[in-house]
Amino acid sequence: MHDKPVALVTGANQGIGLQIAKELAAKNFTVLVGSRDLARGEEAARMVDGGARALQLDVTDQASIAAAAERVRNEFGRLDVLVNNAAITHTRRLPDQTVEEYAKSTRPSVVSLDEIRAVFETNVFGVVAVTQAMLSLLREAPAARIVNVSSGVGSLTRNSDPTCKLAPASRCRLRP
């Protein structure tokens, strides 16, 4: 039996997810660094003190999610904390682009439907799929927790801002 609590952080190979992984490791968790790209996950795991482990996990791929859940079950038998952090945005503002130009380029009326689907697959449906796959493992833990990471762009108030479009619409679905 594994003595330390086990935490899985999706999208932990960079940014906020990586920092969350570091913080959990500092609190004596065994941290699983969830990443679509295993090599990037392994690189990130080396940056986390406390022996974090990379876990290949594409939140938009049911087979990847199932394989990750099976690995957690086989190696640890439970999951104490699930941090749903993985998220994407479809576009970035170019350095020479004005706010007005950027707002026009990100309107749902001009963004391709494939891009919109990709954002929602990761930011909304990926959270649901990973949570569903990990629920039985979370139920094995004495005091399991699920943390859904959102951001200011997920604010319903900000989501009504006409200059703020697609990613906020997907992230506000995670707000309590």
Please identify what each model-predicted range represents:
Residues 83, 130-134, 138:
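Hydrophobic positions on the long internal alpha-helix
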Residues 1-32:
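Canonical Rossmann dinucleotide-binding motif of NAD(H)/NADP(H)-dependent dehydrogenases/reductases
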Residues 8, 80-83, 147:
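N-terminal Rossmann-like NAD(P) cofactor-binding module of classical short-chain dehydrogenase/reductase
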Residues 38, 56-70, 113, 127:
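The beta1-alpha1 cofactor-binding region of Rossmann-like NAD(H)/NADP(H)-dependent oxidoreductases
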